[in-house]
């Protein structure tokens, strides 16, 4: 991401050029290249990058109540369930059955799995930069090559985490629609083929922990998967 430019609104080097406009991944401003008039927008690419930051922040912090972890471990002990058998489907079912959540929250599920498996995520500064870089390319790829602009975060982040050796344990929750599961897998395989042919920048922008934890006044995003 060596082509990031200076944003006149938030004063960060966060402008990405796309077709006839530029958008800032930090403050969400969009600049028309013709007249440079900025405006606030829910531009889906920048929104997805903001949401990714929220996910990384969640995984690097402890927001889940310890009581939930203790209760889940008690259920595992009672039913002789190993931590290696714990996946997103199991955790999600536990949360819903015990009325811990009233909507799907894969970030919470990810965090709980991380606690149960007692795994320290390999998310140092270089890994954060790598994950964000791949995710950015994935967003643009989906925008240009898929009919829907929505992204199954739990599915694709699991793939990216595995690819970058962050973790192999955060398995996504499968959905009942097998066609959708197969579609996500096909998108991922096509994306990998696309990236193999694409000339990648040798210079990766340094996001790091400061980017993940800085507060720009955005509200926490919780999307249903």
Curated annotation (Swiss-Prot):
Record-level Gene Ontology MF annotations: zinc ion binding
Entry keyword Nucleotide-binding: no
Key word Nucleus present: no
Keywords: Activator, Late protein, Metal-binding, Transcription, Transcription regulation, Zinc, Zinc-finger
Pfam families to which the protein is assigned, alphabetical: A2L_zn_ribbon, Pox_VLTF3
Position of the signal peptide: none
Swiss-Prot/TrEMBL GO biological process terms: regulation of viral transcription
unnamed zinc finger span: 7-27
Family under the similarity heading: Belongs to the nucleo-cytoplasmic large DNA viruses (NCLDVs) VLTF-3 family.
Protein role: Acts with RNA polymerase to initiate transcription from late gene promoters.
Quaternary structure annotation from Swiss-Prot or TrEMBL: Interacts with the late transcription elongation factor H5/VLTF-4. Interacts with the late transcription factors VLTF-1.
Name recorded for this polypeptide: Viral late gene transcription factor 3
Species, as recorded: Fowlpox virus (strain NVSL)
């Amino acid at each position: 991401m060596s082509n990031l430019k200076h944003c006149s609104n938030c004063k960060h080097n966060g402008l990405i050029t796309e077709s006839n406009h530029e958008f800032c991944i930090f403050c969400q401003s969009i600049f028309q290249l013709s007249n440079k008039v900025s405006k606030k927008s829910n531009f889906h690419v920048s929104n997805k990058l903001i949401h990714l930051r929220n996910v990384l922040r969640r995984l690097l912090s402890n927001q889940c109540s310890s009581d939930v972890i203790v209760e889940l471990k008690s259920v595992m002990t009672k039913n002789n369930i190993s931590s290696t058998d714990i996946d997103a489907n199991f955790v999600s079912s536990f949360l819903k059955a015990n009325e811990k959540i009233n909507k799907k929250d894969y970030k919470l599920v990810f965090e709980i799995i991380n606690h149960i498996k007692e795994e320290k995520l390999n998310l140092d500064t270089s890994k954060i930069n790598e994950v964000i870089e791949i995710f950015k390319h994935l967003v643009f790829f989906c925008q240009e090559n898929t009919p829907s602009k929505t992204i199954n975060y739990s599915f694709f982040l699991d793939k990216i985490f595995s690819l970058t050796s962050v973790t192999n344990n955060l398995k996504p929750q499968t959905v009942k629609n097998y066609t959708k599961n197969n579609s996500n897998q096909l998108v991922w395989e096509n994306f990998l083929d696309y990236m193999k042919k694409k000339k990648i920048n040798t210079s990766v922008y340094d996001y790091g922990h400061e980017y993940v934890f800085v507060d720009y006044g955005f509200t926490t995003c919780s999307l249903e998967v």
